[in-house]
Amino acid sequence: NTQRDLNIALINELTIIFDKLGLDTLDVLEAAATKWNFHLYKPGLVGGHCIGVDPYYLTHKAQSVGYYPDVILAGRRINSGMGQYVVDKLIRNLIARDFNVRQSKVLLLGFSFKENCPDTRNTRVIDVYQHLTSFGIEVSIYDPYVDAEVAKKHYGVSIDAELLVSKYDSIMLCVSHDQFRSEQDLLLNMLTPDGFVFDLKGLFERSDRVVRL
């Protein structure tokens, strides 16, 4: 799990660099995959009860015997900061489209820590939610897999199990549940005229209304 955490952290850091260079991360990964020994990892939020937790057991033990694990903790720091990073990028795109950030409405797609499951343990979507609401943004969450009562009890958030048709300035795909694939057209029609999808998973077809991580 520590190895997986570090591999994802590398891709997340490269994603931040590529964004500053004006490069699409998924395009770079596709090109890199033409090399026979390339190992594919994709950027995104890193949560769950394993990858985002287990490295701390190892780093705690290492420090208890007098060794500071720089690389492992650096990877954890990068992955833990992705919630803030994606919110910053979303807000930059809202501003670029002349939205009033504090009056914006955002829909988060998915709340579980991985696709097609109801498990919300250590989900980092909560980081995204909290950062967005700290800017005064009105945030809704849609996840057909997650138990709404569990989410309310453990995270204090309201989850819609069904897609409520409304208008949003941005729709952020956080978790790539299969059901979202069949709802792409409906979701795109729920955007305001200058609204956009912020696709963290590369699920939506490319268009001028889709921003990728």
Per-range role (PLM):
Residues 1-213:
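Structural/interface elements that position substrates and couple domains in central-metabolism enzymes
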